[in-house]
Amino acid sequence: MKLLLAFRLVIPALVLAAPLHVAAAAAAATPEQKLTALGLTLPTVPNPVANYVPAVRSGNLIFLAGHIPRDAAGKVITGKAGRDATEKESNAAARQATLAVLATLKREIGDLGKVKRIVRVGGFVNATEDFQAQSQVVNGSSDLLVELFGDRGRHARAAIGVGSLPLGALVEIEMIVEVE
């Protein structure tokens, strides 16, 4: 009975706190301020592991190579959705990979406020044959982009299940972004 009472007290507090956190992020003026309000930081941009560059600018478009998720220690988040990771864990990995893409973008343009539009996101999910929630996993990326950029963050998208990814990564996110 005491446990049930504790849940009745804690759950409403969590529900009330969540909108305040989201509201603070929405009120922030720049994408960088929104990251801070959400308690997020951009990771260090890693060096490419093969013969490619992480970003190519052509006119006002920046094509960002696929980025994989890493934990706070810089270790690649690995596994297969549907076997080693749940949909929720895979969604969080997509969010982490998106932060890595944004770190590369910021290094390329200097200020995320210069983003005019997230044009396209490609999401690749390392998954078992029977895993069918690729779209829900890649929502980890899409939702973050809308949180940070508002309507400028709404984009075309592909969410694709694959048999493996570089370094055994759980997900990989690539982007095309229009900038000033």
Predicted regions and their residues:
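N-terminal secretory signal peptides that target proteins for export/translocation
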Residues: 1-5
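Bacterial N-terminal signal peptides
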Residues: 6-21
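Short, polar/acidic, helix-capping and beta-turn segments at strand->helix junctions
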Residues: 24-180
